């Protein structure tokens, strides 16, 4: 019997494209569902062109594939439930629903996985903001939607309450106490439904709420790094994880606080393609297929730089001058401002000397 599988990927952006490349290297066939015929995955896989919530298209994908996965969390979970058969979607839809709603996510992290999160409260209207202690700093986030800083309002004084009240009256929200952290970090973990494997802790630098630079390993103590990895594994085991999960965290001087989870490979893990013996995309494919998972080894300290639309020319010049560094371009046709167009990975044990592309250009 052939071990070749047909893998259906919901979403044809850069994450779906890199999942597909890993699957193809392993000898599998890939079919992608995406609304755009010219999506990045169209360069490496067959594409069913349809909206993500098109139940007929989801059924066509399901009927054509041995296993399904998704590249992002904004997938119609109800639509998936309507078409999937037992075992067809190893990640399941429970994880989707948890990651789609910050209220569900906070409840899962604090009460089921029992990891440390920032103090928070559920906000259903502006009335829930009337008694907050303005000697503290807060972040108000909509329960659903929002990415790269959208759907959020920082509250530091009464001057911020008008916008915060409007946000609270527009949608269910979560109010989090602001964490005075030293570093933003993340941990990639992959599971196959039984076992898990974990990647090195990554240090992340954001500009305008968009990831700009990832440094591996993160510059934190060994004890904090082990604590961060243990938290990620605990979350993965609570989920009986299949595939790859990213746990985003804050590192303080003496603690790790979990911020949120992404039920898929993550921008901060792209360095793993060159810097580890297996990438986060490799372990994702192995995980959803229920295959044995490798132990992850980092070849050498590495840095990943995001290439946004306004950075493309600078990135192309950079790799011309530094041909040993690795440029990945995703094949997006239009280089819009702040649109993720690619990334560069390089080996360096002096990460402060690696200049982000946005410096001197535009973040």
Language model features by range: what are they?
Residues 1-100, 104-107:
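ATP-binding N-terminal substructure of ATP-dependent carboxylate-amine bond-forming enzymes
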Residues 3, 286-363:
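Peripheral (often C-terminal) accessory segments that flank ATP-dependent C-N-forming ligase machineries
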Residues 24, 84, 110, 134, ...:
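Anion (oxyanion) recognition and catalysis
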Residues 47-52, 121-125, 155-156:
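Short acidic-hydrophobic, aromatic-tinged amphipathic segments that line or gate anion-handling sites
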Residues 60-61, 132, 167:
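Structural alpha-helical scaffold elements that stabilize or flank donor/cofactor-binding regions
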Residues 91-153:
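A conserved helix-loop-beta module that forms one wall/lid of the active-site cleft
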Residues 123, 152-157, 188-192, 216-218, ...:
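Short beta-strand-to-turn element immediately C-terminal to the catalytic PLP-Schiff-base lysine
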Residues 167-220, 226-258, 262-270, 278, ...:
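Phosphate-binding core of ATP-grasp and ATP-grasp-like enzymes
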């Amino acid at each position: 019997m052939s071990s070749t599988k047909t893998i259906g990927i919901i979403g044809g952006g850069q994450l779906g494209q890199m999942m597909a490349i890993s699957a193809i290297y392993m000898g599998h066939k890939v079919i992608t569902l995406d609304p755009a015929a010219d999506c990045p995955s169209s360069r490496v896989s067959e594409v069913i062109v349809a909206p993500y919530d098109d139940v007929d298209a989801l059924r066509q994908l399901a009927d054509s594939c041995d296993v399904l996965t998704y590249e992002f969390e904004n997938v119609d979970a109800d639509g998936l439930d309507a078409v999937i058969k037992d075992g067809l979607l190893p990640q399941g839809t429970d994880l989707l629903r948890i990651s789609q709603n910050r209220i569900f996510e906070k409840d899962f992290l604090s009460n089921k996985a029992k990891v440390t999160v920032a103090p928070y409260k559920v906000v259903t209207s502006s009335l829930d903001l009337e008694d907050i202690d303005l000697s503290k700093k807060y972040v108000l986030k909509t329960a659903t939607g929002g990415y790269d800083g959208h759907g959020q309002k920082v509250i530091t004084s009464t001057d911020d309450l008008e916008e915060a009240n409007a946000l609270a009256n527009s949608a269910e929200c979560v109010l989090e106490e602001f964490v005075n952290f030293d570093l933003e970090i993340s941990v990639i973990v992959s599971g196959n439904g039984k076992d898990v494997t974990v990647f090195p802790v990554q240090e992340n630098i954001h500009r305008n709420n968009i990831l700009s630079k990832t440094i591996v390993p993160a510059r934190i103590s060994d004890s904090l790094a082990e604590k961060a990895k243990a938290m990620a594994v605990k979350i993965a085991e609570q989920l009986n994880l299949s595939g790859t999960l990213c746990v985003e965290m804050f590192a303080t001087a003496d603690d790790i606080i979990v911020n949120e989870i992404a039920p898929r490979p993550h921008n901060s893990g792209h360095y793993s393609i060159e810097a580890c013996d297996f990438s986060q995309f490799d372990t994702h494919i192995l995980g959803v297929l229920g295959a044995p998972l490798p132990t992850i080894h980092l070849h050498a300290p590495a840095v990943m730089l995001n290439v946004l639309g306004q950075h493309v020319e600078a990135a192309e010049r950079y790799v011309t001058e530094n041909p040993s560094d690795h440029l990945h371009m995703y094949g997006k046709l239009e280089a819009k401002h702040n649109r993720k167009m690619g990334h560069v990975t390089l080996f360096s044990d002096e990460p402060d000397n690696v200049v982000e592309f946005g410096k001197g250009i535009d973040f």
